[in-house]
Amino acid sequence: MESNHKSGDGLSGTQKEAALRALVQRTGYSLVQENGQRKYGGPPPGWDAAPPERGCEIFIGKLPRDLFEDELIPLCEKIGKIYEMRMMMDFNGNNRGYAFVTFSNKVEAKNAIKQLNNYEIRNGRLLGVCASVDNCRLFVGGIPKTKKREEILSEMKKVTEGVVDVIVYPSAADKTKNRGFAFVEYESHRAAAMARRKLLPGRIQLWGHGIAVDWAEPEVEVDEDTMSSVKILYVRNLMLSTSEEMIEKEFNNIKPGAVERVKKIRDYAFVHFSNREDAVEAMKALNGKVLDGSPIEVTLAKPVDKDSYVRYTRGTGGRGTMLQGEYTYSLGQVYDPTTTYLGAPVFYAPQTYAAIPSLHFPATKGHLSNRAIIRAPSVREIYMNVPVGAAGVRGLGGRGYLAYTGLGRGYQVKGDKREDKLYDILPGMELTPMNPVTLKPQGIKLAPQILEEICQKNNWGQPVYQLHSAIGQDQRQLFLYKITIPALASQNPAIHPFTPPKLSAFVDEAKTYAAEYTLQTLGIPTDGGDGTMATAAAAATAFPGYAVPNATAPVSAAQLKQAVTLGQDLAAYTTYEVYPTFAVTARGDGYGTF
């Protein structure tokens, strides 16, 4: 079939060409194709005003691959005036399963999300719709902890263009050092996308160190009406030694008795007030003030958008009951103000998850199973073993979204088809009462955690995971992670990154398999036993002589593409006790990388 990736009117030789031409003739909108996307409008005919403000664009996922503008435009027109639609296209003329629609104002965009999310566009095919947010911020990991903000800003301006600001947070244990990563703000999404390409692993080093670069997750945007009722403050950059009593005393000094309760976790805290006025007054008075030897940052908490972010607890019995009154913060933490603090922030240490023997997905809408799953830690978690600040977190794609699970064509988290590991009670078996506390822990370390420990022990730097995907013979989307270890990459650039020889049907399995393959290549066992760390030192000497297999035999390199589309790098944060559950989805950068 003739490739459809070309500039022009976007219609010649396309599927449903007649229907698309009829649509263009009826509406007067332009329809052009460029950089792997087909753009309808932008601006529409007769539009003389400025482009719609931020917050007017929505993401529509789970599109049937043979559905085009002639079906989607009339559906969106019923809700409001369309400024622009961008449908992502593949080389065969099919859509990639998602599109972006910009309405003329925020009200129409919000109505579109409410009306179109889970809309049955065809028999048995439900759309997944959420808000779209431009991302101008990059996460940069691997920065020497002794570097100051000004040094990092100067260095980033030297190697990339369009740098506006750099956000650096001090270490929780030593405020004179940074946390080993920074967030770099660019003047536009395009500038950030170009910088991200330039800074891919192995291309550029900062201060002689290999770096890891990816998108930072955009901050959660909350409307003014909702924020006007918030009476909880978020306080960060506290000393580890600062107690809840010290915090409560400091905030009560502004107005005695105004604080209801305080909950501190590591170097941040949540302060609840009896009314909003007292909270705002305390925020203005104490933001930037030195407390216990450290300047603190004080902001209002941000309530969670229930349409895009749902948290469950294990206590619901897998039924997926939504808790009310949840809050998220500019750091990404979640808080339920109806209870005391429930344990862990959204983005937490990878060890937290890896050590848990059983994580449960709540069963809901057929997308999630309540079978036990242990999720492999992501690069974000490896770098961020403490929560971060208002800059956001290292994200998964060009423009990030917090969305309900199940978005994205062909990628749904479903129950494992393998039989449950249940055993019959046989005659003669004796059931002996026992205390579960006395049991030997049965949790095992996952390969990504073992790989991280090996890299830390040998001072190799944190492993960097890059997700790729390919379409299998049965048209199923398959996944593969390539792994770069900074120190080894600089020593042996010809044989990096580590590329496993097989693809996986699920993203989490692909990550675990890639880590196992890397460990095996380095001659390190992955059983998590006592001998694992004992072999770490030998790995450094074994590495230069290892044999590199033909990693692209099953699928050619040309078929692999960086997985930055929705459903291709979806991290499902499962629940255990009170751990939050959500999905992070991603989109292409809009400049030809799909």
Swiss-Prot record:
Domain RRM as annotated: residue spans: 56-134, 136-218, 231-303
Q: For this protein, what is any one GO molecular function term?
A: mRNA binding
Subcellular location(s) of the protein: Nucleus; Endoplasmic reticulum; Cytoplasm
Per UniProt, the keywords (alphabetical) are: Cytoplasm, Endoplasmic reticulum, mRNA processing, Nucleus, Phosphoprotein, Repeat, RNA-binding
The organism's place on the tree of life at top rank: Eukaryota
Residues with Phosphothreonine modification: 499
Biological processes, Gene Ontology terms:
chromosomal 5-methylcytosine DNA demethylation pathway; cytidine to uridine editing; embryo implantation; mRNA localization resulting in post-transcriptional regulation of gene expression; mRNA modification; mRNA processing; negative regulation of nuclear-transcribed mRNA catabolic process, nonsense-mediated decay; protein stabilization
Q: Which GO terms describe its cellular component?
A: apolipoprotein B mRNA editing enzyme complex; cytoplasm; endoplasmic reticulum; mRNA editing complex; nucleoplasm; nucleus
**SMART domains, alphabetized:** RRM (SM00360)
Pfam families in alphabetical order: DND1_DSRM, RRM_1
For region Required for nuclear localization, the annotated ranges are: 360-409
Tissues expressing the protein? Widely expressed with highest levels in brain, liver, pancreas, colon and spleen.
The subunit structure is: Part of the apolipoprotein B mRNA editing complex with APOBEC1. Interacts with TNPO2; TNPO2 may be responsible for transport of A1CF into the nucleus. Interacts with SYNCRIP. Interacts with CELF2/CUGBP2. Interacts with RBM47.
The family database entries (NCBIfam families) matched by this protein are listed as: hnRNP-R-Q (TIGR01648)
The domain-related comment in the record is:
The RRM domains are necessary but not sufficient for binding to APOB mRNA. Additional residues in the pre-RRM and C-terminal regions are required for RNA-binding and for complementing APOBEC1 activity.
What does the record give as the function of this protein?
Essential component of the apolipoprotein B mRNA editing enzyme complex which is responsible for the postranscriptional editing of a CAA codon for Gln to a UAA codon for stop in APOB mRNA. Binds to APOB mRNA and is probably responsible for docking the catalytic subunit, APOBEC1, to the mRNA to allow it to deaminate its target cytosine. The complex also protects the edited APOB mRNA from nonsense-mediated decay.
Name-wise, this protein is APOBEC1 complementation factor
